[in-house]
């Protein structure tokens, strides 16, 4: 438990009452995470309630840990549940960037906002696809994120409410439009290295 990031520890505490429940399964939390995340993406796209959108995305990001913790602690994991979790992660993250881009089309960025959101979303889609391939070939350890003092890189999403409250969503979109493709290039290089070093199958 001590090796887990802070949000995963909190999620483990949240799901602990349901460990032995036959009615509450990890997929229920995954579905809730997906619905809440998509609601956040839609709110960003509408553009009238960015603070609400940010809170929904943060909640969805936290719930992303609940399904995995319940699966591990309650021995309720399944192959479908794992794929459902991965797909939900991708859909919510891509939807968030696309929603931000659409919502900012009325800003000085104009149509470029949608293009920037699409660029970030496509880059994220590529990252999820390549990480899925690496995990299938080399196990989950191949895609384990680095931690710093109990935080992971993806925890930056918890700062989104500060971004919306400070009116810095345009700057966030710029950072995503540049940073996500750069991250995709890095993950692509990891994937290609893993392909070159993969042991030949007997």
Predicted features along the sequence, with ranges:
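A generic hydrophobic-helix recognition signal that picks specific residues
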Residues: 18, 57-60, 78, 82, ...
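The feature identifies polytopic integral membrane transport proteins across all domains of life
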Residues: 53-54, 79-82, 141-147
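Short amphipathic alpha-helical coupling elements at transmembrane boundaries
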Residues: 12-20, 68, 72-75, 82, ...
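Membrane-embedded alpha-helical segments that form the functional core of polytopic membrane enzymes
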Residues: 26-80
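A feature for the membrane-embedded catalytic helix bundles of lipid/isoprenoid biosynthetic enzymes
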Residues: 1-16, 86-202
């Amino acid at each position: 438990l001590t090796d887990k990031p802070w949000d995963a520890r909190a999620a483990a505490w949240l799901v602990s009452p349901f460990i032995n429940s036959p009615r509450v399964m990890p997929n229920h939390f995954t579905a809730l995470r997906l619905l809440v995340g998509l609601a956040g993406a839609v709110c960003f796209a509408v553009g009238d309630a960015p603070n609400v959108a940010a809170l929904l995305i943060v909640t969805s990001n936290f719930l992303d840990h609940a399904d995995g913790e319940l699966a591990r602690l309650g021995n309720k994991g399944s192959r479908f549940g794992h794929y459902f979790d991965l797909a939900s992660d991708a859909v919510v993250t891509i939807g968030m960037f696309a929603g931000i881009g659409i919502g900012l089309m009325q800003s000085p960025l104009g149509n470029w906002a949608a293009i920037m959101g699409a660029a970030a979303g496509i880059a994220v889609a590529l990252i999820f696809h390549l990480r899925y391939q690496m995990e299938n070939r080399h196990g989950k350890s191949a895609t384990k994120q680095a931690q710093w003092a109990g935080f992971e890189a993806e925890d930056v999403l918890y700062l989104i409410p500060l971004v919306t409250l400070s009116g810095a969503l345009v700057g966030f979109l710029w950072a995503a439009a540049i940073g996500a493709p750069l991250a995709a290039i890095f993950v692509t290089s990891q994937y290609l290295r893993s392909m070159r070093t993969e042991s030949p199958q007997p």
